Amino acid sequence: MPLELSPVTVPKPWGREIWYSGVEQRGVCSFACGGGHSPIPWLQAVVPDSGLGVAAEPLVLLKILDPRPQPVVGDLYFELHEEKREVYVVTGIDPVAWPGGQGGNSAGLRSPAPADYPDQQAFRQAYLRAVQAYEAVRRELDGLAGQGLAPGPEQLEQERFLREAMNDFTYLQPVAVGDVVTVPLRVPHSLQHGVRTIEFQTPVYERKILSFAQQVQTQDHWDTAEAVQSMLLEAPPQPALPVLQQGEGLRVERVVDFPDFEVRRITLQGVARLDLEAGQHYALLMVVAGSLRLGGAAFRAEQAMLLPRGWAGVLESAQAAQPLVLLWAVPRR
């Protein structure tokens, strides 16, 4: 039977994350069972044949990123990953932050003045100098805050000037509701304020922070000097999603096909139904829009569940007048 995932909210300097399948020191998600909650590792340990995933091995990490709508304080870390694979599906754009309906995601770098840099290495070093100049004033402001002191107008103006000079090197990718954003390894990226997404990622804590316009809480240093040498400067274009299945009121698209997990988007309209099997691994299922009827229950947007290994059933809308959009993820091992 499907097991609903009970989310955990994790505060962040830029907003919050809502975890559905995370198990680590910062939070342990649970299965909603019989009116109560059972932590994911507990139930994994007692279900035979790894039906809910291998005990002591993390599930594919499913979460919602919910940044604040205000510029700067709602922008995520500008960071890159060397092992962790990520994909975002945009579900909301704050209308005050982005009146035109298109939000932003910083992805890779661009040259503010191409003629000034004879080669790629010169460009990397110019970017590093811009970040280090901003980091110096950032640490000065953080030190004042730690003493309960407020910065003066000149310090605030210097922070703004150096932050904008640093950000001139980054490429801002426009995103809208429904867009899929695949984050390639070693590409610096930063989801911007007011852009709400569903994220699937490799369940490892690994990153290099290039910059952040607030005080970093999790480490006492930035990794810019090291990251600049290995980073990819440009993010490849986002490819069109392959359509795996299409029929009357039915569309199944492949969102990503990573070495460690796959994600598909399923859209059902009217009375369309889809027969589906979890196969040899568990599957994660998240409702993006509409209402799903499954296992005698109805699930609404931003509710998620784990389907045990070997599960088979029918996906259908609980409200035929409204399209049903789902995200389905399965591990590769």
Model-derived regions: residue spans:
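Ligand-binding loop in jelly-roll beta-barrel domains
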Residues: 83, 93-95, 187-206, 298-300, ...
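His/acidic/aromatic-lined binding-pocket segments of jelly-roll/cupin-type domains
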Residues: 79-81, 86-89, 172-173, 180-181, ...
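Loop-centered beta-sheet repeat module
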Residues: 148-207
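Short histidine-centered beta-strand/loop micro-motifs
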Residues: 73-81, 273-279, 296-297, 316-318
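Short acidic-glycine-tyrosine-enriched beta hairpin
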Residues: 170-182, 293-314
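C-terminal amphipathic alpha-helical segment
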Residues: 206-279
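Transition-metal
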Residues: 1-147, 213-238, 263, 333
